[in-house]
Amino acid sequence: MYLRYMLTFSFSPFSHLHSERIYYRQLEEKDYDAVYQLRYDPRVRRFISSEYEKSDEAVSHFIRDSKIKTENAELVMWCMEEKSTQQVIGIIGYFRLYPEHHRAEIGYVLLHDQWGKGFASEAVERISLYGFEEMNLHTIEARVSPLNIGSVKALEKNGYQWEGTLKESYRVNDEFTDTAIYSLFQRI
């Protein structure tokens, strides 16, 4: 079956979602402290290629910018809140959208003290389902450091298949590192 149309996305009104242990909502200014930790904790940063200006204004700008870009359907990002504690545990979303190809790139980051609890697997499952059912995606792609074993396991647990590795494709902390590409396809 050939799809001869380009997808159009609209994230307004914003979709608040749930999974077993996680509530997914729009990122807000009240999430400043958690976003600061996600952006600047070196234990988290070791797997992320982006370099961020370290300032209060940069964190506030990131939060405002994510809302604007979501309203403009350039991306969609959810703040993940653990239901039992109502504490922010991370961020997940589609950071690159390719509507002409019916494809998007999923990305997520968890606070370090939330690693190893199964939250990444649960969130990837829920947001992948949203991508297929609500956004009508054909392909969801993830790009991860092969050294980030927890992230690789979360993807594989949800059926993502390893597509290949780009050698020394990103610079993290002034060192070149590989990127593993994983994909999940909607079966029609």
Located regions from the model:
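Hydrophobic residues in alpha-helical segments
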Residues: 39, 48, 70-71
